[in-house]
């Protein structure tokens, strides 16, 4: 059972509708929680967490009561695998000591991404061909996460080939080895990247 942690209903920004459908396509069981629920943290069938996209903006160094639900489940499930998507990746970056670079305009659309050989992308055949590491992915964000240089355990695993400043920037991370990951793009947003979600689930179940 995957636990999806969000206070939102589906909308164009969080892509929850697409996330739910992608999981249903593989008959992956999931539970959605929209509040800090003491009953859920007692459950023994929760195998992993997904923190999906959100419509509101995450702020780097400003307390936000809206983030209480994410931190609640991260605290109470300290050893569970976690996948943060867009907003979820931003939350994890702050949780693990990184920061966010804020922009006034939205970064939205399909852009090229270089994928590493990380197991999250295992078995993936990129759009540019089997011998390429490059894929197109769907983005929708204002704040770009930046890994803390003082914490080498936070590892970059994918990169936007050309961001708004014309440079290459990390857009996916491994925060805790073989357990906690974040991607700034929406893998549920395009069929070509659905297998990232499936790889996350398959790895969880293979370790049960």
Whereabouts are the PLM-identified features?
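Zn-dependent metallo-beta-lactamase
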Residues: 1-25, 30, 35
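Amide-donor transfer/coupling interface in amidating biosynthetic enzymes
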Residues: 2-13, 39-40, 45, 71-73, ...
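Conserved strand-to-helix beginnings and helix N-cap segments that scaffold or border functional pockets
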Residues: 16, 61-65, 194
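Active-site metal-binding loops of divalent metal-dependent hydrolases
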Residues: 54-55, 89, 187
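Gly/Ala-rich beta-loop-alpha elbow adjacent to hydrolase catalytic centers
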Residues: 84, 88, 93
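Conserved active-site segments centered on acidic
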Residues: 94-101
């Amino acid at each position: 059972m995957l636990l999806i942690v969000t206070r939102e209903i589906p909308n164009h920004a969080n892509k929850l509708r697409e996330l739910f459908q992608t999981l249903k396509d593989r008959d992956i069981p999931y539970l959605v929680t929209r509040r800090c629920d003491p009953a859920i943290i007692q459950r023994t069938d929760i195998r992993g967490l997904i923190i999906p996209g959100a419509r509101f903006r995450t702020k780097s160094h400003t307390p936000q009561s809206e983030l209480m639900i994410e931190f609640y489940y991260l605290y109470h499930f300290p050893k569970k695998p976690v996948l943060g998507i867009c907003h979820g990746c931003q939350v994890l970056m702050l949780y693990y000591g990184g920061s966010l670079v804020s922009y006034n305009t939205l970064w939205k659309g399909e852009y090229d991404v270089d994928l590493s050989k990380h197991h999250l992308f295992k078995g993936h055949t990129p759009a540019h061909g089997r011998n390429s590491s490059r894929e197109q992915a769907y983005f929708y964000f204002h704040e770009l996460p930046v890994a803390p240089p003082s914490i080498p355990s936070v590892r970059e695993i994918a990169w936007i080939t050309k961001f708004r400043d014309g440079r290459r920037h990390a857009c996916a991370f491994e925060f805790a080895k073989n357990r906690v990951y974040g991607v700034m793009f929406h893998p549920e947003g395009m069929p070509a990247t659905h297998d990232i979600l499936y790889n996350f689930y398959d790895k969880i179940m293979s370790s049960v």
